[in-house]
Amino acid sequence: MADIQLSKYHVSKDIGFLLEPLQDVLPDYFAPWNRLAKSLPDLVASHKFRDAVKEMPLLDSSKLAGYRQKRLAHLQLVLITSGYLWQEGEGGAVQRLPECVAKPLWNVSNDLGLKPVLTYGDVCLTNCRVKGGDIEVMYNLPGGAGTEWFLKVCGLVELTLGKGAQSVQNVLDGAKANDKAKMTSGLTELTTTIGNMQAALAKMNDNLTPDHFYNVLRPFLGGFGGPASPISGGLIYEGVSDAPVTMIGGSAAQSSAMQLLDNLLGVTHSPDKQAFLDEISNYMIPAHKQLLADLTKMPRKVPQIVAEAKDANLSKAYSGCVAALTQYRTYHIQVVTKYIVTASKSDSPKSLAYKDTGKSDLIPFLKEVRDDTEKMQK
């Protein structure tokens, strides 16, 4: 069996998929990016952000040094893009991105294998810095404390998984060595981790209202292209190409966490649901996407090992872990209902990720994925 080590995929056994601590600003040459990204909320509120972007010089992204600087640059540039596009709301969106943003964003994206659009990997995994065991949000989108809380809670969920990453590694190592005791221990610990992730997600209710998420923050997570998008024809990246580009918006569906747990536990989905999840994975950090792919290639999957072992303790640990993941997904449906479905006051509510791909059946989709998980207990 292939030896899968999380550390080879930019996954830390302390903070999981979050990026290891880095400086919150780029070198002085990139001061215009630093300044605009930091001042985005205030400049958008005063309707001066677009003008400030137009005055920004075209900087040479090849002066960025190393992976972490490029990740930070990508975060800054997609935030600047978001502020520029959505400063006047969905009704006032523009269809062209100035070259001073578009060209370096395109180049940095190519260097990293990322999409040139705001993703979960940017606003959460790069943007949320672990400090003193807590999450510090480096850059905020419009909306003040409510928006910052949303980003922080996303980071807390990821950090909680990160603290349990060793249990994931133990399951993988146990599966490779056919070590039933190690697998049992890993699955038991992972069950606790998933429960803790649900508790972290529940903190969303403390300082974020549905109205704030849906009407203040959500538009700035938007993608472009397609009949449901305010930028229906796609976005033109000036200085790159005159052909409009279509991208889906930032969404927690782009987190690798749930697909990691699915692939580890052997949860499978119907072809149409898997096709959407595969499309979403194209918006993940490439190393994280590769981890998910490598997990699916394991010659002997965890459910098979559990079934063949006929070990009561291992079976109980596996079933408990699947039950915890099922419960997490049930709670996540409640969160989505509160912050998207109810807040939208629409007969066919859509999250932006689903809008941009033409899917309007958000809640049925999530319920089917939850049910796919629950079936693994039988």
From Swiss-Prot:
Disulfide bonds: none
Highest rank taxon of the organism: Eukaryota
Residue sites binding heme per the record: 332
Alphabetical list of InterPro entries matching this protein: Indolamine_dOase, Trp/Indoleamine_2_3_dOase-like
Name listed for the protein in its UniProt record: Myoglobin
GO biological process: 'de novo' NAD biosynthetic process from L-tryptophan; L-tryptophan catabolic process to kynurenine
Cofactor(s) essential for the protein: heme
Family: Belongs to the indoleamine 2,3-dioxygenase family.
Protein purpose: Serves a reserve supply of oxygen and facilitates the movement of oxygen within muscles.
GO MF: heme binding; indoleamine 2,3-dioxygenase activity; metal ion binding; oxygen carrier activity; tryptophan 2,3-dioxygenase activity
Keyword Cytoplasm on entry: no
One GO term describing the cellular component: cytoplasm
Keywords associated with the record: Heme, Iron, Metal-binding, Oxygen transport, Transport
Cofactor binding note of this UniProt entry: Binds 1 heme group per subunit.
Note: In the presence of tryptophan, the autoxidation rate of the protein is greatly accelerated (25 times).
Blocked amino end (Ala): residues carrying this PTM: 2
Presence of keyword Oxidoreductase: no
A Pfam family the protein falls into: IDO
Oligomeric form and interacting partners: Homodimer.
